[in-house]
Amino acid sequence: APAITLAALAALDESAGEDPLLLVLSADHFIKDEAAFIEVVNSAMPLALKGYMVTFGVVPNKPETGYGYIKKSTPVDGVNYAYHIDTFVEKPNYDKAKEYVDSGDFVWNSGMFLFKASSFIDELTKYQPAILNACKLSMVGACHDLDFIRIRVEDFSLCSELSIDYAVMEHTKKSIVVPLNVGWSDVGSWSSLWEISKKDSCGNVIHGDIISYNSKNNFIFTDA
C-alpha cells in the first residue's frame, strides 16, 4: 500500500488538476493474451471513473492453494462483467479450493487494480491515515532524478508494511471485481514457471546442454 500511495500522490501532483486513473500491476506477473487484457482494462475504466475501486480477478482453471480468492456478489450497475465483492478469502486448502472453483462464484485475487488516484487517497484517509501521512512527509523535498522521484527514506520507513488488500480493499465499500481470463500467472513457483514455458513432446521444459532419458513433465535448467 505505501508504494501505491506514493504513486497516487505523484500522479495527482503532476496531473495539472486532473484526476488520473492508476493501473496497478505487478512487475513479475505473466499475461499471455495482452490484447485481451487491455480489452478488460478498457471495459473497467468507466467504472473506475465513477469512483469504484476495481480489482481484477482471474477466472480459475483448477483448484489452486497458492492464491487468495475473491467471492463475487451482485453485478455492478447492471453490467455483466463486474461484480460487487462478497468477501476476500485467504489461501485455502485443496478441498476448499475445489469447492470454490466448482461453485463458479470465486476468482483468484490477481493483485492488479484500477482506480482514480483520488479514490485511493480518499479510502486510505479513512482506513490507514498513518500510511498516507508518512508518504506525504516523504514526498516533501523529494528530488527528481531522471525518471525517478527520490523520496525521504526516513519518513517513508515509518509506513506499516500492509498490502493494499489489508489496508484498503477489504474495508472499502467501493471495491468491485472484474473477472479476466487472459492466461495469467504470478510465476510464484517452479510448477507455474513450467506451465507457462515452451515444452517438448514429452512435456519437458529444457534449457541448456541437457541429456534426458525417459523423462516427462520436468523443468530442467542449466547454464552449461
How does the language model describe each region?
Residues 1-76, 122-127:
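Conserved beta-loop-beta/alpha segment of the NTase-like Rossmann-fold superfamily
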Residues 73-107:
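A short, charged helix-loop
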Residues 25-27, 34, 57-60, 73, ...:
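Fold-independent oxyanion-binding glycine-rich loops
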Residues 3-6, 10, 43-46, 69, ...:
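Alpha-helical scaffold segments in soluble metabolic enzymes
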Residues 68, 111-115:
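Short glycine- and hydrophobic/aromatic-rich loop-to-beta-strand nucleating segment
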Residues 115-224:
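Left-handed beta-helix
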Residues 103-106, 110, 126-129:
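An anion/pyrophosphate-binding glycine-rich loop and adjacent beta-alpha core
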Residues 22, 86, 105, 112-113, ...:
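A residue-level structural signature of the nucleotidyltransferase/glycosyltransferase Rossmann-like core
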